[in-house]
């Protein structure tokens, strides 16, 4: 059984991690739960999983109120060191970095130093400090959770690094794929939050609509896989999660129905593959379309 820390347990990826712990209670034990300020979610999860520790980054949260609402004998930290303290607890094997932004950077670095496995869903950490993090981490200590980078990781598994020619990330195009410049002038935030394939948090959904997310993912891929040869293609159905081209011009791709359940569970259990609720692909009722991105 593996002890889990969930940094960002109230978010979309955090909820997938908790679902994994629910589905496989013989595989995972929640050791620490951390949120920014969503204490309602934190309290609910604490009563369900009875962790050793809970942390809240927002120093404005009332410590005494939180203590009254939580089960007894749980360590509580509110404020600056909440995330770092979460990873430095006995019984921790895996740190799921599922928060957004750079707040978890120090906690991730500490976890690497302590020799913990990192299931990394936080792209901002790598964008801001990728060289430092990857130089500190051992091989396969960081397992990416982003669907695209998980796909690349899987495609490269067992391949010598000098076989790699380039990485090809796929992009759905977001909510506004196919819109004309005039149509884009009239779009609204509500429309931007309506992603055609993925159920994600608000920030990443907006970043997907503007294609900013893909820019961050390209930087993330360069750090994770130690290459500058990273391209992307528009693939509206999000069936191919990414591809790798090798020196012999062969291409290996990872395909699955769009769901974060697979990359989350893969990162937590690497290199096992446990059952999921993800819909099987029907190869007789699908087609794969790819488009070149517009040049600006």
Stretch-by-stretch model annotation:
Residues 1-296:
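Catalytic, metal-anchored helix/loop core of enzyme active sites in primary metabolism
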């Amino acid at each position: 059984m593996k002890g889990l820390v969930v940094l960002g347990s109230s978010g979309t990826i955090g909820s997938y991690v908790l679902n994994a712990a629910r589905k496989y209670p013989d595989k995972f034990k929640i050791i620490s739960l951390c949120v920014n300020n969503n204490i309602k979610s934190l309290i609910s999860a604490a009563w369900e999983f009875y962790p050793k520790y809970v942390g809240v980054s927002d120093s404005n949260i009332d410590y005494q109120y939180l203590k009254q609402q939580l089960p007894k004998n749980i360590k509580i930290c509110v404020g600056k060191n909440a995330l770092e303290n979460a990873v430095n607890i006995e019984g921790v094997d895996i740190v799921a970095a599922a928060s957004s932004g750079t707040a978890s950077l120090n906690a991730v670095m500490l976890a690497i130093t302590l020799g913990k496995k990192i299931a990394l869903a936080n792209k901002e950490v790598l964008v801001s400090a990728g060289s430092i993090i990857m130089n500190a981490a051992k091989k396969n200590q960081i397992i990416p959770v982003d669907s695209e980078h998980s796909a690349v990781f899987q495609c490269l598994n067992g391949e010598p690094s000098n076989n790699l020619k380039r990485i090809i990330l796929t992009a759905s195009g977001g909510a506004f794929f196919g819109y004309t410049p005039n149509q884009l002038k009239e779009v609204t935030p509500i429309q931007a939050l309506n992603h055609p394939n993925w159920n994600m948090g608000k920030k990443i959904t907006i970043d997907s609509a503007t294609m900013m997310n893909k820019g961050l993912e390209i930087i993330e891929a360069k750090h994770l896989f130690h290459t500058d040869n990273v391209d992307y293609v528009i693939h509206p159905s999000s069936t191919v999660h990414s591809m790798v081209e090798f020196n012999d011009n062969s291409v290996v791709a990872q395909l699955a129905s769009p769901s974060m359940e697979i990359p989350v569970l893969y990162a937590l259990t690497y290199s096992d593959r446990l059952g999921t609720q993800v819909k099987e692909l029907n190869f007789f009722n699908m087609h794969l379309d790819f488009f070149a991105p517009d040049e600006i």
